[in-house]
Structures are given as C-alpha cells and as structure tokens.
C-alpha cells in the first residue's frame, strides 16, 4: 500500500520545499519509489511538466530530486498572480480561469475533485508520496473549503508533520500556537514536528523540545541545521530575491530589474552561480548600475503592468542610457515583449490597458492573444551556434523586422529577434542560461574565459548533500516507517 506524509509549516517560507526535495532524494537513494505532491501552489515561477502542462517550478525540482518524470498531477492547482485581474488559475496543467482573492475562496470546493484525482494518480505505482502544504494551517480564516493544508489532509487521510523555522525566532510559540488554534479534527492529523534552519549547539534546545512536547504531545522528528547546499538550488518565491546577495566581485556586472510581477526568475540562477559574474537584482527605488555590461529584462506575468512600473521607476531611461554607452540587453519572454515598439492587448487579457509603448529597442510589436504556448523545447542560439534546452510559457505573438534576425531556432522554427547592431536580443525561451555551452559563449563575448560549471550537475550534487544531511539528523525510526 502506498504511504503518504504531508509537511505543513507554521508559516510561509519555513523551508518546506527544500525539505520535501531533500526527502525525495533521500528515499530515492534508498530505492524507494517516491513522488512529490503539492495540492495548491501560488507562484509565477512555473515549469512545463513532461506530460505537457504547467506546474510550480518547486514541484519540478522535487521531481528531479525523486528521479521521476515531472507531471501536472504533482501540482494540480497553480495560482499565478497577475495585476488588476487577480490570479490565473491553472488546473492539472491547463488554464482553468481567473479570479480575485475573495472569488477564489468560493471556487476552491470546485477544485477539490481535481486535487484528489491528481493525488490518486500520484499514488498509483509508487511507494511513497511526500506532500507539501502551503503557508500555514493556522490561517483559520481560510480553512473553509481549504484544499492546500488540513482540508486536503483530512479528505485524503494523510498524516501531517509540522515544520517550524527557528531562524526567524519564536518557533516554540509558532508550534504551540498552531496546536491551540487548530480544531480537534485537524489537530488529530499531526504526527509530530521538525525544527528547521537551526544554527548553533542543538543540545541547547533540549528544554525547548520538552516544552513543545508538554504543550502538544507531539514528538520531535528532528532538528535540521541551516542547509548551505539549499543556496545552490533554484529559489521558489520572489520573496527570496530580497535576501539574495546584491552583487559580488565578479568581472562582469549583470543587472536585472525586479519587476512587481516577475516570473521565472530562476532563469538567472546559473549566472548567479558563476564566480566571475556580479549579478545584481535592482529593487524599486534603485537605479540600474551604470557600470553594468548587460541588462536582462526578466519574464513577467503582466507585461503591460510591469512595463508601466518599469517606466515609473525610471528604468526605461537607465536602459536607454545603458544602450547608448554600448551596453547590451537581453529580454526573456515578457521582457522580450517590452523591448519592442508596442504591446497590444485588444481583448484585455492582462487588464484594462489595451496597449502601451514598449522600450523601442527592437523593431517588433506584440499582440496578446488568449491561446497560451506551453512546451518544453530544444533550440539553437543563432548568435553563438550553441545548443539550448528550455521551455516556453507565454501569451502573445511578436512580429516585426527584427524577427528576420531570430535569436534562436526552437524545434526548427525561428524565435525571438536581434537588433542590427547586435546589442539587443529577445527570446521566448526560458532556461537558456542553464545550457552550459550557451552560457560559456555568452560570457566569453564579454571577455570572460574561465572554465564554466556544469549547472545541472551542481543542482544534483546539492540535492544529494541535502539528503545526506537530513538522513543524519532526522529520526531514523520515523524515516524507516515511511520507507517500509
């Protein structure tokens, strides 16, 4: 019989995603057939699953950790926040609808069937499913109709382990407070807890374990230290961008403006990992650095809205000055659309603004259309004759004279555009910097000739290191009970 366990948190960003990924790799290394599952995720960081639809990139990473093909059933409900139109709702990989926050609460019961169907699909033919909750089960104002935490756990009869983040402080109060605020029906689902992100001498927390046990009766399944290897994994949420280093001593400075609805920002992770690259995420209120050699406009869930915000920050003037100095610009997906002369949205897909001027750096125009392109792709860089692999997730069609100079050829068809002087490039392909050969040639064009890392291998190594650390600190009897 397939076993299942669910990790829920005392709050957001307590480390559930990394723990699920680490446990998936731990059990995969033991020969256990394991799969990840997250009933509901909210993120503009999406991936294209191998069966052809959208899921959160966190679940894609967890499938990599489990050494199984990714599937839309690993994340049956994905909410992608937009601008004034609320969130786009993806169900089992496909666009299901749009809703604002209050409206979505009323829609959740309609989605429970799809969630349970996907969970049954994930359980079939496997030994263990590791489920990740969202936010905190203690948000009792959202409990009615819940499909992300205890609402799912009680319906699917999946036991829960609570994760508390000691690094942010107040972990005892968070765990004990969750116990007291939950109704008895939900409390009965919890089988223990894990303390995450611990720094220092674990023995000093002994009285803390006694206190938590005294208040709740829950056993502690382990105290997990701060996992340094987690920093080498692609980040899941844009909130992580606030904590990333604001640059290093790398020879090439690359500037990325952090747009309000930035999407798929893990595109930049391979560049961040290169020691001779100084990757700077530019926040609201900051100027784009004048000494940057390259500016990259990221993907966006709301191209027109983010383009208007980019102008409000004055970044359009910074980018124009950058190009006049001979600087280069790359636009990815929504960032590519922003580089053109105009962005049209006659159907109001993104909102009430039906068109806005682009930055005018490429002689192209984009028209939003309801059909969404979602696919994994192999490609070739026309500029560097380098192989690429990545994925496309976008609305809209881009046309214009500069498309006669495509930046890439994706599955045999031209994609993207380049300016006549070669300074400006746009593409719809996400993940291009993960391709080691392309990244090496791009950096070499800036005079960086150092040996390049194998990015995929570095992620695999990080997952193995996390699995090894978890095996050393988590309760062996608890792990064995899940493996057996």
Swiss-Prot record:
Residues 251-438 form the GATase cobBQ-type domain. GO terms for biological process: cobalamin biosynthetic process. SUPFAM superfamilies: Class I glutamine amidotransferase-like, P-loop containing nucleoside triphosphate hydrolases. The active site is at residues 333, 430. InterPro entries: Class_I_gatase-like, CobQ/CobB/MinD/ParA_Nub-bd_dom, CobQ_GATase1, CobQ_N, CobQ_synth, GATase_3, P-loop_NTPase. PROSITE patterns: GATASE_COBBQ. Keywords: Cobalamin biosynthesis, Glutamine amidotransferase. Pathway: Cofactor biosynthesis; adenosylcobalamin biosynthesis. One of its GO terms (molecular function) is catalytic activity. It holds the Pfam family GATase_3. Catalyzes amidations at positions B, D, E, and G on adenosylcobyrinic A,C-diamide. NH(2) groups are provided by glutamine, and one molecule of ATP is hydrogenolyzed for each amidation. Belongs to the CobB/CobQ family. CobQ subfamily. This is Cobyric acid synthase. It comes from Rhizobium rhizogenes (strain K84 / ATCC BAA-868). The gene is cobQ.
